[in-house]
Every structure is written in structure tokens, then in C-alpha cells.
Amino acid sequence: MSSTVWILISILLATVGAVVGFFVRKSIAEAKINGAANEAKRILDEANREAEALKKEALLEAKDEIHTLRTEAELEIRDRRSELQKQENRLMQKEENLDRKDETLDKREQQLEKKEDSLVARQQQIEELESKVGELVQKQQTELERISNLTREQAKAIILGKVESEVSHEIAVMVKESEVRAKEEADKKAKEILSLAMQRCAADHVAETTVSVVNLPNDEMKGRIIGREGRNIRTLETLTGIDLIIDDTPEAVILSGFDPIRRETARIALDKLVQDGRIHPARIEEMVEKSRREVDEYIREVGEQTTFEVGVHGLHPDLIKILGRLKYRTSYGQNVLKHSMEVAYLTGLMAAELGEDEKLARRAGLLHDIGKAIDHEVEGSHVEIGVELATKYKEHPVVINSIASHHGDTEPTSIIAVLVAAADALSAARPGARSETLENYIRRLEKLEEISESYEGVEKSFAIQAGREVRILVKPDTIDDLEAHRLARDIRKRIENELDYPGHIKVTVIRETRAVEYAK
């Protein structure tokens, strides 16, 4: 019973609590709604006030901007009006200037018309005077023809002939003086260039040798070199083409031969055999082959070093090797490689003085005797062989012509070719460059004079400049100018056929005619 009552009481209390809570929440919600409405009204009022303020501010800014634009427009209109006024003033000034120029031109036109009228009048006067002068000249010519018994054409021919004779003589004198002066200046310049080139080029004195000497540790080695029944020495001589001279010279073997490359190969091979101690035909053959390879490599190195020293680049490798062979070639005792380098230096120096291509000149000078490296192996002169080599390896046409013309076989086609020939003569002619015994030298001078004096009409001959020139004095009443040229050619041919000489020999025939008169 009591529990049921408590349950009912609890339910009743819960119901009352729920009703009370409902009304409380409702009153709270209504209060919040009223607060929110009031807040919204307040915000709306503030927004209206701010909008009104912004509207007034925008109106004020718009008024200021309108005022500013109006002011700028007024200033721009004022500036344009001022500029238009200035342009109008300038146009008015130009118009005034044109009016003044127009007046000036009118005045000048009037003056020119007056001058033209004056010139027409003067021209008429001149024509009248010319007519009168022509009549007077005609009368004078007629009178002169009557007095001199010569027509006008005859008199003109006489005067022109006399003038032509006088002018021709004066021109001939002037031409001769110019030629003499030009020759003197050219000779002077050539001497300066040659002296400068020779001063700046230093070269060695060389001498020819046809033997080499190999030193031995003792004389017992000579027997080992000879071998049993001479088989070792025969093998070495057969393989190298060099004669071995074993005599009483202590501790030395002499190698004799005219081919320097073979002689050098034999020397190196024999030196290696002596150092090795094993000397028999098989070992000799091995050492000779090894020495040939060493000599070939040395020749190539010499060629490369030569081109580097002279400053010539771009040569074909085969041509460099052929150039190195010149180290073992001599001409009248002068080493051909040293001679070629000397010619290259001299040609380059002279070309530089004349404003020519110095590098091309050195190249031509270095290769001018390239044919001498193999002229003993190939048919033909060293000039022909050199031209073939240069053409084969596509050298410059100037280089080819320099090789072909440096001994006068063909005409030089460039200044460099002439310089190469001059440098070749300088290198060969300098003291000590080429060896020649005193006996041969004197015999050659005597033979030169003997050949020259063997011709009819020759009065006297002189061999000068160490036998490099022969001067022949002829009788002018027996030998005329044309005969003098023929005589020089004949003597030159006989010298070439009958004499052996280094370099060139210049043949000069001198015919002197003297006319003497005595004024009393």
C-alpha cells in the first residue's frame, strides 16, 4: 500500500516538474527572441547611419574630383590656345619671309635679264671681231705663203717635225735618266736587303767526309770482327754496302763509303756488335736491320726538328722524312740540310723586308733542294726530282716554281722564286760554305780565262769574285752589240760543258765604244 502511494506521488511530482520546466523554457526563449530583435534593430540603425555617412563622403569626393578635372581641363585648354597662338605667329613670320624672298628673286631675275642682254651684245661684238681677225689671219697666211714659197701644210709639217725631234730627244734623255736612277735605287735597296738578311743569319762552316771511325775496346776485337775466314766482315760489308778498313790503327775500325746513310747504319750496327760481344752472321744481320730502323727514325726526327726550327708547318709526313735524309747529303762539302735551312732563313728575311709572305718564302727555301735527298736513287736532276716530289705532295705552286727555277732551268713566276735563287747563291757563295782545293780553284780560274780568250774578237778576260764571274773585253770594231750577246751565250755553254764548279758563273761581255773629238 505504502509503495503504491510513493509511486503515485513520484509520478505526480514528475508531471508537475515537467509542466513547470516547460513554462520556464518558454519564458527564457521569449526573452532571447526579444533580445535578438532589439539587437537586430540596433545593428540596422547603425548600418543606416554608416551608409548615410559613406554616401555623404562619396558625394564630397565626387565633388572634389569634378573640381580637379574641371581645373585640369581649363589648364589644358589654356595651353593649347597658347600653342596655337605661337604656331600662328610662326606661320605669319614664314609668310613674311617668303614675301621678302619673292621680292629678292624678282630683283635677281631682273638683274639676270639685264646681264643676259649685255652678254648677247658682247657676243655679237666678239663674233664681229672674230670675223675680222679671221680675215686678217687669212691675209697674213696668204702673204706668208707668198713670201716663203711654202703652203700652210708644208710649214706645219716642218714645224711639227722639228718639235717632234726635240721632244723625242728630251724624252729619251729623261727615260735614260729615270732608268739609271731606278736601277741605282733598286741596287741600293737590294744591297740593303741582302746585307740585312746576311747579318741576321748565322751559319756553320761545314766539311765533307766519306769515312767514319768506330772505336774498339782492344785490338783483339778486330779478329772477332773479321771472323773465321773473313765471314763476319764480308757479311757486314754485303748487308751495308760499306767497306771496313782494318789496319794498324790502334783500337779503331774505319768505315769507308760515299753513302752517308749506309755508312751511319754500318757504324751503329758495328758499335752495337762491339758492345754486345756476340759477332756472327746471324747477329750481324739482326743488328744491321735494327740499325736501319734506328736511322730511319732518327731521319724522321731530324726532319720534324728542322721544320720546327725553321717555322714551316703542314708538310706531308713522307716529305718530312725525305727532308731529314738531307742531313746525310753534302754538296761540295756543304751539308745540304744546313744549306736548305740557311736558304729558308735568308729567303724569309728578304721576303719580310719586301712585304711578301714570309712563311711561304721559308717553305720554298727549305724545299728548294729536296730532290738531292734521293737523286742518287731516282733518274733525273735534283731539280726535276724536287718538282715531282712537291707536285706529288700537293705543295703550293710558288714552292714548285721556286724549286724549278732556282738554277735557272725555268723562268721564276713570283718574287719568292727569285728570292730563293738569290738566297741559294748567297748560301753557296759565302766563305767556308763549300770546300775546294787551292789547286782546283786556280785551275778553274785559268780555264775560265782560257775559254773566254779562245774566241775571235776578244781582247782580254778576267775571272773575278773567286771565279764566280768572268768579264770579257771585246774589240768594238770586230764585235757588234748583237755579236756580243751571241758570244756571251757561246762562252756560257762551253763553261757548262767543260768545267765543274759550285754555284753559278756569271758571264759578262763588255763592248766599249769611244768617240773623241777636239774643239779648236
Curated annotation (Swiss-Prot):
Residue ranges of every copy of the HD domain listed in the record: 336-429
Q: Which SUPFAM superfamilies match?
A: Eukaryotic type KH-domain (KH-domain type I), HD-domain/PDEase-like
Segments passing through the bilayer: 4-24
Q: Which GO terms describe its biological process?
A: mRNA catabolic process
- EC number(s)? 3.1.-.-
Its primary localisation, in coarse terms, equals membrane
Q: Which GO terms describe its molecular function?
A: RNA binding; RNA endonuclease activity
Q: Where is this region: Disordered?
A: 86-116
Membrane protein topology class: Single-pass membrane protein
Q: Does the keyword Repressor apply?
A: no
Its localization reads:
Cell membrane
- Record's keyword terms, sorted: Cell membrane, Endonuclease, Hydrolase, Membrane, Nuclease, RNA-binding, Transmembrane, Transmembrane helix
Q: Which GO terms describe its cellular component?
A: plasma membrane
* Enzyme class, first EC level, given as a word: hydrolase
Residue ranges of the KH domain?
A: 210-273
Similarity-based family? Belongs to the RNase Y family.
| Entry function | Endoribonuclease that initiates mRNA decay.
Xref: PANTHER family:
RIBONUCLEASE Y
Q: Could you tell me what this protein is called?
A: Ribonuclease Y
Kindly list the organism's lineage: Bacteria, Bacillati, Bacillota, Bacilli, Bacillales
